[in-house]
């Protein structure tokens, strides 16, 4: 098979960017409902056409690569659907309303953003999962922030920054384990070495969030009172429902599978719906049914579809609205289409051609790290999956780092700096799509405020430029 040139390989990426630009410009937030997916499929068709007509790639090879890509994210799709049900159950079961009710009274608005980042960081370190952190405590923090008058971009940015700090440094994180294993670096050696770039990034982020918090004009206490009163009117606020996040935390600490943990958490929240919020379920069920049938129908509708309960204020009505598993379907569809594109580019040799282009710029330390960062970012854009990007980046540069005498921990750190934390900043990446869907905040809205994620690759390059704590394992040949 002939290998396409980097210029030809970049053509589908350029076409995708142009198509997405006009699609988002025309459809806005509705682009996720089908427009973006069509853009990805059209670009996939372009890749396949180029590969089959000019480079001798068979459709069977392309199809096989696409199937492998989709198989690789199958567990993520299941998690997404469960998260949709969990988010609805936590809201309508009174878990999130109770957390918000007490949270707005405990967390001072001046310290909210920095507290938001720190809380998510701690939870994510303990759980090893940014997705679980954002889908649980992140949703509650969004509600608290809105009640205190913060813009949703700032709130989501603080949540994303904290959650991905924890995801990056936690020994329980799958990306942390993957980056260390792919580069043959001991896990805790990898984690310790990441601190030289991770700590400056998170400290700068916390300073920015602190300044932003003190610059924020807090909502009138009467507005917060209206908010909390509205929650108390709609839901039965009780400490008993907080057993759900407590049990969830215990399961996570015991390293129970993410799918099992989320499923049990959802089931417990459903019990809370039945015990503490039966009136809410009857309202969701609507007229025509009563008794146990109404409760059963309410649970089914809540977990599977959208609900919109009327509250005392429009803001509160919007906050307590849920989308269930059905609300995740656009994201699932988008991920499937993104995997099609990644598979087609892989089968046609385009990803390999582009990544080899980055390898040419690896003559000195700074350029080697910069090329690794650029390659990781590109793969995140092209494959739409952080796991694939970590594997490809690590395998591609492993020999180069060894040849130049750089320690494997430098490659593992740079890979995480470039891939793990930037994945939620890309609208069509699995992480970007998921977090935007869970928080109900478009990726491009929270992107400017996700300071930790933006700073990490820049700090990584800067540290390489000054040569801080970078040694060669052997002399260069």
What are these regions (language model features)?
Residues 10, 182-198, 202, 343, ...:
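C-terminal transmembrane helix pair
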Residues 142-154, 440-444:
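Helix-coil boundary and interhelical linker segments in multi-pass alpha-helical membrane proteins
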Residues 135-141, 159, 261-269:
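Central hydrophobic cores of alpha-helical transmembrane segments
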Residues 17-21, 48-49, 118-122, 143-144, ...:
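Alpha-helical transmembrane segments of multipass membrane proteins
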Residues 55-146, 305-398:
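Membrane-embedded alpha-helical segments and adjacent helix-loop junctions characteristic
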Residues 159, 164-172, 198-219, 463, ...:
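Transmembrane-helix bundle segments that line or gate the permeation/cavity pathway
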Residues 1-79, 196-206, 213-337, 477:
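Hydrophobic transmembrane alpha-helices of multi-pass small-molecule transporters
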Residues 131, 163-178, 391-400:
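Short helical (or helix-break) motifs at transmembrane helix termini and adjacent helical loops
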């Amino acid at each position: 098979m002939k290998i396409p040139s980097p210029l030809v390989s970049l053509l589908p990426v350029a076409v995708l960017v142009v198509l997405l630009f006009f699609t988002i410009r025309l459809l806005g937030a509705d682009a996720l409902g089908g427009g973006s997916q069509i853009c990805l499929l059209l670009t996939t068709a372009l890749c396949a056409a180029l590969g089959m007509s000019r480079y001798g790639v068979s459709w069977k090879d392309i199809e096989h690569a696409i199937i492998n890509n989709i198989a690789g994210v199958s567990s993520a799709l299941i998690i997404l659907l469960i998260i949709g049900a969990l988010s609805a159950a936590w809201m309508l079961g009174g878990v999130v309303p109770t957390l918000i009710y007490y949270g707005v009274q405990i967390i001072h608005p001046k310290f909210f953003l920095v507290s938001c980042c720190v809380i998510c960081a701690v939870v994510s370190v303990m759980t090893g999962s940014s997705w679980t952190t954002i889908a649980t405590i992140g949703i509650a923090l969004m509600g608290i922030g809105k009640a205190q008058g913060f813009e949703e971009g700032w709130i989501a940015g603080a949540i994303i920054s904290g959650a991905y700090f924890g995801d990056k440094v936690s020994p329980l994180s799958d990306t942390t384990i993957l980056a260390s294993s792919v580069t043959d670096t001991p896990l805790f050696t990898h984690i310790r070495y990441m601190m030289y770039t991770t700590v400056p990034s998170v400290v700068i982020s916390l300073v920015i969030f602190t300044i932003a918090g003190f610059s924020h004009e807090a909502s009138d206490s009467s507005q917060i009172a209206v908010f909390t009163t509205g929650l108390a009117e709609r839901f039965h606020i009780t400490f008993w429902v907080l057993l759900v996040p407590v049990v969830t935390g215990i399961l996570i600490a015991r390293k129970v599978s993410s799918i099992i943990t989320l499923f049990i958490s959802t089931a417990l929240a459903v019990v809370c719906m039945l015990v503490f919020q039966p009136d809410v379920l009857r309202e969701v069920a609507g007229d025509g049914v009563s008794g146990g049938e109404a409760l059963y129908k309410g649970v089914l509708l809540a977990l599977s579809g959208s609900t919109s309960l009327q509250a005392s204020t429009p803001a509160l009505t919007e906050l307590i609205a849920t989308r269930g598993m059905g609300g995740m379907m656009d994201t699932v569809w988008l991920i499937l289409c993104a995997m099609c594109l990644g598979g087609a580019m892989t089968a046609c040799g385009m990803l390999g051609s582009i990544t080899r282009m980055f390898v040419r710029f690896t003559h000195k330390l700074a350029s080697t790290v910069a090329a690794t960062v650029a390659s990781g970012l590109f793969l995140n854009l092209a494959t739409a999956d952080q796991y694939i990007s970590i594997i490809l980046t690590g395998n591609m540069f492993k020999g180069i780092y060894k040849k130049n005498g750089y320690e494997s921990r430098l490659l593992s750190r740079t890979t995480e700096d470039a891939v793990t934390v930037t994945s939620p900043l890309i609208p069509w990446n699995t992480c970007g799509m998921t977090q935007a869907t869970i928080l109900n905040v478009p990726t491009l809205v929270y992107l400017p405020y996700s300071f930790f994620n933006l700073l990490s690759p820049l700090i990584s390059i800067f540290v390489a430029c000054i040569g801080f704590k970078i040694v060669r394992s052997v002399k260069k040949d």
